[in-house]
Each structure stands twice: as C-alpha cells, then as structure tokens.
Amino acid sequence: MFVPRSLKLKRNSNDDLKSCEAKKSKPEAAGLQLEGNRETLVLESVTKEAVTADRPGSASSTSSPSCQLAEVCSTGPDQGVKDSHPSEEPVKSFSKTQRWPEPGEPVCVVCGRYGEYICDKTDEDVCSLECKAKHLLQVKEEEGSLKPSSPQGAASEPESPLDAFYVYKEHPFIVALRDDQIETLKQQLGISVQGQEVARPIIDFEHCGFPETLNQNLKKSGYEVPTPIQMQMIPVGLLGRDILASADTGSGKTAAFLLPVIIRALPEDKTPSALILTPTRELAIQIERQAKELMRGLPRMKTVLLVGGLPLPPQLYRLQQHVKADTMLKMGFQQQVLDVLEHTPSDCQTVLVSATIPDSIDQLADQLLHNPVRIVTGDKNLPCSSVRQIILWVEDPAKKKKLFEILNDQKLFKPPVLVFVDCKLGADLLSEAVQKITGLSSTSIHSEKSQVERREILKGLLEGDYEVVVSTGILGRGLDLVNVKLVVNFDMPSSLDEYVHQVGRVGRLGQNGTAITFINNNSKRLFWDVAKRVKPTGSILPPQLLNSPYLHEQKRKEQQKDRQTQSSLVTGANLMDIIRKHEKSSSQK
C-alpha cells in the first residue's frame, strides 16, 4: 500500500493496488503555515503504524515483494492504477514515467526520481509501484542478512518478539559492582547525579538488553560504546523517570533520550507515543533522521516531522484525525512550552535536555518534572573541553579585516568555516563580502530564507560544498556539524549560554576544534561572565577585557551580593548576633 504525501483519503481496500493514493499536485495550506521569519516550535511524534487484520475468507491480504514486482512488470508503462475517484491521478506503475525532483522535493530511495508516494511498510519515499516492489525486496534481503547464522543441527534459541513488553533490569555485571566502584566510575567519567533511587550507569549498550535489531542499528549508526551522558541517562530513561540532563555539546544527548523513547514506544498501541519539542527546524530534522536510523526494521515504528515554513498537509499525513498537533502548530511558536505540555497526559514521562541549564530551566523543571533525576556530565554551563577558545578584542570597524585575516591564515583556516552574526542583513552582506574579497565559496543562512533553501544550504555545508557559511543563531543549537573545525563568532552572542551553544558546533564527540570570538565594549555586560566561565578553560583573555572598569564593577557587585547571601544564613557562629540584632530592633520599636 502507498500513502500519499498529502492528507489520507478513505479508499476501498479490495486489493493492494486500489489502495494506492496519488499525491495532490499542490495541497492547499493557506492559513496553516507558520510565520517564516521567526524561530519555530517544532513538534515531532513517534507514532505506530496501524495493523489491519486479514479479512476472513481471503487467501492473503498482501503479496510478497517479488510477486508485486512481477505484477508491475506485466503492466504497460503508461498504465496506472485507477481507483474509484476519477478526478485523481492514477498511481504510476513504472519509474520512467515519473519526473525528476525539483530542489527540496522528496527523492525516491531506489531510482532518485520524484518521491511522490510513501511506502507505508517502510516509511520511505518511492516514485512508482515498480520502485516500491524493488525497495521491499531490498529491505527483505537486508533483514535476512541481519539474522545470525547458526550451524545445522544446533538448537538456536529464538529471539523474543520485538513488541514483547520490555522491562529494564540491571545487567548482572552492573549489579555485581560495589557501591564504591560505581562512585569511582562516576567520578572518573565526570557524571554527577541528584535524585532518589537512581539507576546505576551502564558501561556497554548490551547491558540494556535491547532487541537485536536495535543493537544492529546502533552499530550501523556508529555507536560502539556509550558516552558518559548515555551511560547514566539511558537506564534512568528506561525506568520511566523524569530527567533534567546537561552535558557538553556533541556528547551524544540525542541518542541518550531517543533510545528510551523507542523502547517505551514499542509495545504502545496509542499514537503518538512521544512528543519531542526542539527550538529550531534544523534540529528537528536532524533528530528525526537519527530516530529513523535507530528505528529501522522495528515493527510499526514511524515518525512525524512538523515544522513551520512548509505546508502542513504533507507533514500531517501519518497522524490520526483525533491528534491535535496541528492545532498546537497553528497557535504559533510564541506559546510557551508549558501551554503545549498541558495537553499531554498527567502521567507521561518528561525529559529536559540541554548543553546549558540556566536558572530559568531549573525553575521550569520544578513545575514540569515529578521526582526528577538531575544528571550533569562535564562542567555545567561551560564550553566543551575539546574546543580551543580564542577571545580577540576587535572594534566593530575592524571586524571584517580581522575575519579576512583568519580566512587567509593557513594554520587557522580549515573549511568549512561557520561564522555567526547577530542579524539577517548582516549575514547576507558579510557572506557577499567574503566571496568578493577572499574568493571563497560562501553563503548565508537565516530564518527569512525558505525551509527548502535552508535545507539545501545545510546539506551543502555537511557535504563540503561551501567553504564559509555565515549564519544567525539558527545553526547554533544541537546540530551535528561534524566536518566543521572552525567557528568564528563575528558578533559576540547576547548571553554566555548562547556562546556555549555556538562554540559547541565544533568539538563534536570529542573531536578537536577552534572557536574564535570577537569582543568589544558592545558586550560589556558579559565581561564578568566571560572571565568566570571562559578563563578557567585555559583561554587567554585580552587585556582590554581584563582591565575594563565594567568587569571590575560587575565583579564587585557579585561579591557584595554573595556576602549578603552568606550573612543571611543562620549558622552556629552567627546565631547569637542575629538574636541580638532582632532584640535591638524590637526594643527601638
């Protein structure tokens, strides 16, 4: 069966071919698009494919992929499958009758033509019945190659069904470790945990008892051993606990929350089973791609990606009519996360994950999380230790010249270079200047560009098509830009948390990288924060910053505030002084 790239329509289910649905040429989405010039609240739901029982009396409700391929090949190239709705286009039988895709359109996984349809068995884009049958044959062969071969006559223990109810139990190896050994392990890995009855960290993915298909997907995706945040966060998530987690940029946080989501969604009948909110479209697209890699071959597992800037019907085709995700999208991203989560069940598991945990997130966690486990790996709210940070004092008129010097420096210049600026117009102008002056291939990316343009630019960045990409903050959070070795903060970010995220585009998963930041008196309110959080990493700060009166004034105010806080605390040493002050003030009244 095919699923069109538009909203589902009711069909007669007499046979597999009649149930194929063609995509409407231009789905009407007026009034459903979000404003493209702002950051977007993104909703992603892990859903299940509906299972339809065979009708009694029928020999078989589905045919094998090879039979489907033979059936397609016996049909003329110009013959499509017509249904009871004469106003709609017939489903294309052969790939050669399908057109080539335009930029940003889905691509057939078999032949590369326009992916007009979606195979509901694999959730992949296909262009015709012919490519659907070929694709299913490929999937069947891949699944056969994953099955472990056993010697003839040897009794092989059957693997438990993937949709069997999963209960996480600590591996015997983990149980056998003493408490002091666990604490030593946490200290060596930099894992800090707060909470009641917290699960012990795992040391290997095999300690989780995942289905073999998921273990194979982990290896194919490059996950050999868990990172520190994954060691602690995965077992806690598998037990259904609420989590507030902070870890270095590029430390594997996405897989740390995706694996428990996938496992807990396997036996669920209700759809959707999980909702993931991200601050940018690009991060949502990346998370969905990683989820699909990990879910490949697992039964009835699907994803839905809902982002602003694209027509909603093609994104909503997998959701049942009773799901209210489209309503939440139309409300606009400016609604707070609290408003969205009010629509979720009261007993659902909630996980908050970030590279930085400011006070606002701590306050939000107190409202959202029930008996949470707080997990921190690395230095909280500090840049990743594998990133070499360089802070340069550069006045605004000299910024372009300094950037061109860096791009011409053979020791520093390692393309592709990611340059962050604070406004959209500045991104466009700086990108043009870089290409004109240095001759390097350059482009800009920001929220005013269409989603199709942004996707193509991001793809080009990852594939090395651009030597320099000038961006606003939309590329500053969560994205795995593994080939980026140099980041330049042309404009100092508005907060140290944003600085940590932007610097974190290099140094992914322990790789070395360099981040160069231009700073001047326009960022004077951040001087003390920079000194506190960047200097401990070994970075040399410019003397203009260290000798600035703004820095010394901010330092004095913070020290005074700390002294006031200390004096308000009641201890054995100051208890009598507090009593005397209270008696004196009472007698004066």
Curated annotation (Swiss-Prot):
<dbReference type="InterPro" id="IPR011545">
    <property type="entry name" value="DEAD/DEAH_box_helicase_dom"/>
</dbReference>
<dbReference type="GO" id="GO:0016887">
    <property type="term" value="F:ATP hydrolysis activity"/>
</dbReference>
<dbReference type="InterPro" id="IPR014001">
    <property type="entry name" value="Helicase_ATP-bd"/>
</dbReference>
<keyword id="KW-0539">Nucleus</keyword>
<keyword id="KW-0694">RNA-binding</keyword>
<protein>
    <recommendedName>
        <fullName>Probable ATP-dependent RNA helicase DDX59</fullName>
        <ecNumber>3.6.4.13</ecNumber>
    </recommendedName>
</protein>
<keyword id="KW-0862">Zinc</keyword>
<dbReference type="GO" id="GO:0003729">
    <property type="term" value="F:mRNA binding"/>
</dbReference>
<keyword id="KW-0479">Metal-binding</keyword>
<dbReference type="GO" id="GO:0005634">
    <property type="term" value="C:nucleus"/>
</dbReference>
<dbReference type="InterPro" id="IPR001650">
    <property type="entry name" value="Helicase_C-like"/>
</dbReference>
<feature type="compositionally biased region" description="Basic and acidic residues">
    <location>
        <begin position="12"/>
        <end position="27"/>
    </location>
</feature>
<feature type="domain" description="Helicase C-terminal">
    <location>
        <begin position="399"/>
        <end position="549"/>
    </location>
</feature>
<feature type="region of interest" description="Disordered">
    <location>
        <begin position="48"/>
        <end position="98"/>
    </location>
</feature>
<dbReference type="InterPro" id="IPR050079">
    <property type="entry name" value="DEAD_box_RNA_helicase"/>
</dbReference>
<keyword id="KW-0547">Nucleotide-binding</keyword>
<dbReference type="GO" id="GO:0008270">
    <property type="term" value="F:zinc ion binding"/>
</dbReference>
<comment type="subunit">
    <text>Interacts (via HIT-type zinc finger) with the RUVBL1/RUVBL2 complex in the presence of ADP.</text>
</comment>
<keyword id="KW-0863">Zinc-finger</keyword>
<dbReference type="InterPro" id="IPR014014">
    <property type="entry name" value="RNA_helicase_DEAD_Q_motif"/>
</dbReference>
<dbReference type="GO" id="GO:0005737">
    <property type="term" value="C:cytoplasm"/>
</dbReference>
<dbReference type="GO" id="GO:0005524">
    <property type="term" value="F:ATP binding"/>
</dbReference>
<keyword id="KW-1017">Isopeptide bond</keyword>
<dbReference type="Pfam" id="PF00271">
    <property type="entry name" value="Helicase_C"/>
</dbReference>
<keyword id="KW-0378">Hydrolase</keyword>
<keyword id="KW-0067">ATP-binding</keyword>
<feature type="short sequence motif" description="DEAD box">
    <location>
        <begin position="323"/>
        <end position="326"/>
    </location>
</feature>
<feature type="domain" description="Helicase ATP-binding">
    <location>
        <begin position="234"/>
        <end position="375"/>
    </location>
</feature>
<dbReference type="Pfam" id="PF00270">
    <property type="entry name" value="DEAD"/>
</dbReference>
<feature type="modified residue" description="Phosphoserine">
    <location>
        <position position="160"/>
    </location>
</feature>
<dbReference type="InterPro" id="IPR027417">
    <property type="entry name" value="P-loop_NTPase"/>
</dbReference>
<feature type="cross-link" description="Glycyl lysine isopeptide (Lys-Gly) (interchain with G-Cter in SUMO2)">
    <location>
        <position position="26"/>
    </location>
</feature>
<dbReference type="Pfam" id="PF04438">
    <property type="entry name" value="zf-HIT"/>
</dbReference>
<feature type="zinc finger region" description="HIT-type">
    <location>
        <begin position="104"/>
        <end position="133"/>
    </location>
</feature>
<feature type="region of interest" description="Disordered">
    <location>
        <begin position="1"/>
        <end position="36"/>
    </location>
</feature>
<feature type="modified residue" description="Phosphoserine">
    <location>
        <position position="156"/>
    </location>
</feature>
<keyword id="KW-0832">Ubl conjugation</keyword>
<dbReference type="InterPro" id="IPR007529">
    <property type="entry name" value="Znf_HIT"/>
</dbReference>
<feature type="short sequence motif" description="Q motif">
    <location>
        <begin position="203"/>
        <end position="231"/>
    </location>
</feature>
<feature type="modified residue" description="Phosphoserine">
    <location>
        <position position="64"/>
    </location>
</feature>
<comment type="similarity">
    <text>Belongs to the DEAD box helicase family. DDX59 subfamily.</text>
</comment>
<feature type="binding site">
    <location>
        <begin position="247"/>
        <end position="254"/>
    </location>
    <ligand>
        <name>ATP</name>
    </ligand>
</feature>
